[in-house]
Amino acid sequence: MREIVHIQAGQCGNQIGTKFWEVISDEHGIDPAGGYVGDSALQLERINVYYNESSSQKYVPRAVLVDLEPGTMDSVRSGPFGQLFRPDNFIFGQTGAGNNWAKGHYTEGAELVDSVLDVVRKECEHCDCLQGFQLTHSLGGGTGSGMGTLLISKIREEYPDRIMNTFSVMPSPKVSDTVVEPYNATLSVHQLVENTDETYCIDNEALYDICFRTLKLTTPTYGDLNHLVSATMSGVTTSLRFPGQLNADLRKLAVNMVPFPRLHFFMPGFAPLTARGSQQYRALTVPELTQQMFDAKNMMAACDPRHGRYLTVATVFRGPMSMKEVDEQMLAIQNKNSSYFVEWIPNNVKVAVCDIPPRGLKMASTFIGNSTAIQELFKRISEQFSAMFRRKAFLHWFTGEGMDEMEFTEAESNMNDLVSEYQQYQEATANDGEEAFEDDEEEINE
């Protein structure tokens, strides 16, 4: 019932994805060989959301692993959970995309995409009632961004009524891995705006800050960063996998979180995050979780929610707790910080409560915010994009793969439109709307 097919593309996507499967397997009591070693019937009750049970009682992830070079795949296969995945579901090319979006989207990736879709189709046929897809990828590289967005649009064609959910690692403001990141990211956002239902914006820099400031890790590794991401990913789908007092699924989240179809870029957060040494000094209570969850330092995207306003928020609480207390806290935070919530969506916090906490915690919570402050992230990418595009720097790598400059111009203006849409709704009030919105509709229709 309600299965989710997971796809990971590119190096970043595969590393986050693999970490995610470690976390999920741990929650469901699945060992690295796919056997069940858990201790509670609840772990197996809805295990088929993410796992397929083979004839030999082995649980196999509904995961498709995609990359244009064999390197990352090999390290996944030789990693601790490498034997968990179905060998046929590793699909890789030999050439690599070389951080080039055009290679991932038009040339190398396009050659591989049909064999990926075959595997995706096979996974979907094993499903009883497919809920949707989740993709992990980064927007800075070539494969995750170029081929990832190609996969999204192909899957969208074939399964138009299923939810498409992406966990996208955005380029960071200060840390840049590749020079052409702004190009790749802008071209990807151009696709994500049209083709996904929910996109969780994750940012390495924000994750570094959390590891450094909050978790007090002096030298955070990618493993630590990916662990944070996978905690959030596990939180988002927790009510599909475990019974709860108030359930949410991907579609409910989308319906409650997306007021306008293009504005589906969310900031995730997770609580409790405490340094290893100071854990025993903190009481885990609902107020404490709520406090930390709405804290700007806790956001996994490098945007400050205090610079914008929340259109909508979803929170998933995990662990034994009283619903009444959760509701009171949510009401309190909306009343106390009412200026940070748009007033034209009255009750804009969606709550889900699940009874089973993550491993090793008494209670935890996941935060998903649709805030207009996310425009900072797009503005940043857009400025870097314009600076390079004005001089046509590095363009020959993309045009050489058959792309047209026009496509860059379109992507740029689409991203700028997105920024101004966020800005427009940030400034909108409950009663000024009548004339203002009529003008906007005309503009959009042109």
Curated annotation (Swiss-Prot):
GO terms for cellular component: cytoplasm; microtubule. Its cofactor is Mg(2+). The modification 5-glutamyl polyglutamate is found at residue 438. Coiled coil: none annotated. Its main location: cytoplasm. SMART domains: Tubulin, Tubulin_C. GTP binds at residues 11, 69, 138, 142-144, 204, 226. InterPro entries: Beta-tubulin_BS, Beta_tubulin, Tub_FtsZ_C, Tubulin, Tubulin/FtsZ-like_C, Tubulin/FtsZ_2-layer-sand-dom, Tubulin/FtsZ_GTPase_sf, Tubulin_C. Pfam families: Tubulin (PF00091), Tubulin_C (PF03953). It is found in: Cytoplasm, Cytoskeleton. Some glutamate residues at the C-terminus are polyglycylated, resulting in polyglycine chains on the gamma-carboxyl group. Glycylation is mainly limited to tubulin incorporated into axonemes (cilia and flagella) whereas glutamylation is prevalent in neuronal cells, centrioles, axonemes, and the mitotic spindle. Both modifications can coexist on the same protein on adjacent residues, and lowering polyglycylation levels increases polyglutamylation, and reciprocally. The precise function of polyglycylation is still unclear. Some glutamate residues at the C-terminus are polyglutamylated, resulting in polyglutamate chains on the gamma-carboxyl group. Polyglutamylation plays a key role in microtubule severing by spastin (SPAST). SPAST preferentially recognizes and acts on microtubules decorated with short polyglutamate tails: severing activity by SPAST increases as the number of glutamates per tubulin rises from one to eight, but decreases beyond this glutamylation threshold. A motif (MREI motif) lies at residues 1-4. GO terms for molecular function: GTP binding; GTPase activity; metal ion binding; structural constituent of cytoskeleton. Mg(2+) binds at residue 69. Keywords: Cytoplasm, Cytoskeleton, GTP-binding, Isopeptide bond, Magnesium, Metal-binding, Microtubule, Nucleotide-binding. GO terms for biological process: microtubule cytoskeleton organization; mitotic cell cycle. Tubulin is the major constituent of microtubules, a cylinder consisting of laterally associated linear protofilaments composed of alpha- and beta-tubulin heterodimers. Microtubules grow by the addition of GTP-tubulin dimers to the microtubule end, where a stabilizing cap forms. Below the cap, tubulin dimers are in GDP-bound state, owing to GTPase activity of alpha-tubulin. The MREI motif is common among all beta-tubulin isoforms and may be critical for tubulin autoregulation. Belongs to the tubulin family. This is Tubulin beta-5 chain. It comes from Gallus gallus (Chicken). The lineage of its organism: Eukaryota, Metazoa, Chordata, Craniata, Vertebrata.
